Curated annotation (Swiss-Prot):
One or more lysine residues are methylated. One of its GO terms (cellular component) is cytosolic large ribosomal subunit. Keywords: Methylation, Ribonucleoprotein, Ribosomal protein, RNA-binding, rRNA-binding. This is Large ribosomal subunit protein uL11. The gene is rplK.
């Protein structure tokens, strides 16, 4: 018989930097899950990634206090900021442009994000990422 699921916990945790402090500790603690076990497993799985890269993770909590977790790809905004070489997006996205991204950079990001996007093909995924870039105040070239 399958384990009974008691809830899901969604967090964004920096790669390789999971520790019991907030937000991880309180979120897992209120469900009675082993915080250090999650931190060690998460840090081991994100060992090869760029340290500090935010990784969305969905933790499935079971009635017997066990858990499983699935990691998703980094947020598109993080990847776009990294590609454009900026710290943050524009406060007035359609007025003030803060950087540029090329079609090649958008395709690279779309390939990374394709598993998490609902786009039918790569071109649709590129258009989705381009829309995110425009809403951040980035100038999109070649789309």
């Amino acid at each position: 018989m399958a384990k009974k699921i008691v809830g899901y916990i969604k967090l964004q945790v920096p790669a390789g930097k999971a520790n019991p402090s907030p937000p991880i500790g309180p979120a897992l603690g209120q469900r009675g899950l082993n915080i250090m076990e999650f931190c060690k497993a998460f840090n081991a799985q994100t060992q090869g990634m760029e340290p500090g890269m935010p990784i969305p993770v969905v933790i499935t909590a079971y009635a017997d206090k066990s858990f499983t977790f699935t990691m998703k790809t980094p947020p598109a905004t993080f990847l776009l900021k990294k590609a454009a070489g900026i710290k943050s997006g524009s406060a007035k996205a359609h007025v003030d442009k803060v950087g540029k991204v090329t079609r090649a950079q958008l395709e690279e990001i779309a390939k990374t994000k394709q598993a998490d996007l609902t786009a039918a093909d790569l071109d649709a995924a590129v258009r989705t990422i381009a829309g995110s870039a425009r809403s951040m105040g980035l100038e999109v070239e070649g789309v």
